């Protein structure tokens, strides 16, 4: 049996929480979707394996890849779409966690021509500016070239929509990435519901967004949200 450092064990435990929290918040899609985690600037990363649901992940099922997709630790298969993660990691050394899932409302919302608005608190986390949309293909991102294109679309943003496919979220902490993925789905859902009204809908004016972000999305509040999600999952 392989041995792991304390730091490696903790990273795998946090990544397991990330996967299960996303599943607990409606982002499971049978065995599809994946999350990765690394130390900032590292040339390897831990990843959820293929053929396993987000809700099924345990610390000992995770695999570690290099940026070329070679498995350097673990025995299970990797996802074909590892280039989403590797190319964002190459492009942005500060990023430690990348989430790619297929949440229902985000897919539906991104298929419209609406820009995301701050219809809800969650929307204010992302816009303005608008959340970018990757439109080159709705197929799987299985090559370095396509991964680079996704990373270019994301740019310096936290999130982007993959049209008719899913979402990508990247952040400097695993907690931030997971919460942002959940909040993007919530923001997409609320705006879809509001836009279905024949009466039109309102959203927070752009000039009020900085104050709203400063009040709602503080590190202390985000830590409390993460801890709540972890309590729902229980010990790992």
Model-derived regions, located:
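Glycine-rich flexible loops
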Residues: 1-236
